[in-house]
Amino acid sequence: GPWLIDVQGNRYFDAISSWWVNLFGHSDLGLRAAIGEQLQRLPHVMLAGCTHEPAVRLAERLSARTGGALGHCFFASDGASAVEIALKQSFHSWRNRGFPNKKQFVCLKNGYHGETLGALAVTDVQIFKDAYGPLLMQSHQVESPDTRLSNEAASLQAMAQLHLDQRNDQ
């Protein structure tokens, strides 16, 4: 659960949950059992051109949740790595289609995506921009959608079109 216990036995509600996110709480019994069971079967396999049954089952469950729209799954070891891989796949896709200059990215203002260089490039946290700006690829921040506004979809579409019109070869 969300509780941390110090050496004196004091309990603290973990409102920080690691630096940025902790999806599962601390020491969840079901998660511990599933990890232990998997360790007994296959502790680690690199999914580079191969797979295993739990990965296949998870991919099928994810695809089913999208109504079958998700045709492929790529599993990464953590969120920052997943963002990094998505950026590389996007660049690679554009390059393969004859657009090697498309190497800038659009991201949401105030977004945080991890601390690899690629993830930091699409993160809008000033302390990271100040520290690592010269190392980061170029990105453009746009306002986050506000679903409380009735015309949000139209304004978001107009903003996206304006952004693309200004940078269509990037």
Which residues are covered by each model-predicted region?
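Active-site and channel-lining beta-strand-loop segments
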Residues: G1-D14
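Short clusters of small/polar residues that mark proteolytic maturation junctions
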Residues: I16-S17, F105
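A structural motif shared across PLP-dependent enzymes of the aminotransferase-like
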Residues: G1-W3, W20-E37, A48-E60, A121
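PLP-dependent aspartate aminotransferase-fold enzymes
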Residues: E60-D169
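Histidine-centered active-site/metal-ligand motif
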Residues: H26, H44, H113
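Short, flexible active-site-proximal loops enriched in glycine and acidic residues
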Residues: V45-E53, A69-C73
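Short acidic (Asp/Glu) and glycine-rich catalytic loops that position anionic groups and cofactors
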Residues: R11-A15, E37-R41
